[in-house]
């Protein structure tokens, strides 16, 4: 197994076997391997050692949430998980304040309310789609505004992993000549 807390030790076992001609598969129980996943480091290490890596398209919460959001999908930015540090998270969100593309984030249930509060404070009350437990039995998409989502999840405890799809900043239209 290869995960955040054992990746150095596991890589020391996996890489020599791959260099010796064996094959391996990187599988994740949390969506597409290597996307907001420690497998990203293993793919990089393989590349550094000249090991060919192939990907078989699989579940992607980002694309699933975008497709189900009802928000613009032509151009988007995927920001992964925000920092757990309050200061770093707010600084990150400040860089997105004027982003015109649709914004996609991952969030854990225990941090959802705090993140929605920060989104509201920094981005304002934009449209948002919250995808929960995508492609699973209890799949749910909530299409609302950031403020309404904040009220909803303050009142009911969030469960499951979330993908947040947020409308980008409005494009300023200059004067017509």
Language-model features and meaning:
Residues 1-56, 64:
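Class I S-adenosyl-L-methionine
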Residues 1-8, 59, 80-85, 133-136:
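Short, acidic/turn-prone active-site loops that include or flank metal/cofactor-
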Residues 12, 37, 65-67, 89-91, ...:
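Short, well-ordered secondary-structure micro-motifs
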Residues 16-19, 42-44, 69-74, 122-123, ...:
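Short, hinge-like loop/turn segments at secondary-structure boundaries
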Residues 19-24, 102-177:
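A contiguous loop/helix-start segment that scaffolds small-molecule binding in enzyme catalytic cores
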Residues 28, 55-58, 105, 130:
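General beta-strand structural signal in soluble alpha/beta enzymes
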Residues 32, 59, 82, 86, ...:
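Conserved phosphate/pyrophosphate-binding and hydrolysis machinery centered on Walker-type P-loop NTPases
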Residues 41-99:
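Class I SAM-dependent methyltransferase SAM-binding "motif I" and its flanking Rossmann-like core
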